[in-house]
Amino acid sequence: MNEIACYQQLIEQHLYGKLGAVKLLRYIELKSGHSDNGHAWIGCVTPSKTGRTLYFNGRGLMKRKGQRRGESGGNYVDMESGESYWVSGVKKNGQDRHWAGSGKVLVESAALSEYLKVIGAKTLDGTRCEVTSTIRQTDIERLSRLANSSGKGWPVDPEKARNPYSFQRNVSRAKE
């Protein structure tokens, strides 16, 4: 059974959230201001019940509505900062970064064994990737409340919005 069918079956059987958090292996790349050279990770994301929000590295990434890519080329947007991200499944050939991009992809240490299985390798290619243990915990409860609060996030009626493909930022990110 493929990943999507398995996920849909959990939702239909009302088991989502009762069996522990669903984790999906994904490639995540920051697009805002970086084109194809932004920071990039391979790690486990936790999807919301609808699958429209992914939680990873302290962020809530909401799927863009309408056209798949915004001005920056991303298909997800950080609900707090408004930064654009590209999120996709990992490629079996291990060449996840765009051909025009550069920089190493950080592989989450907790996802390393699963990633190596997917690409059919025994070791990581050190010229393209490196292992990291700096992935932050994500406060899913807080971000979920933020995403579901009224009047925030995506416009209720995209047809009436000035730009139906733009995301309305919810809050300002706290200075760390």
Residue ranges, per PLM feature:
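Mixed-charge, low-complexity intrinsically disordered regions
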Residues: 2-44, 53, 59-176
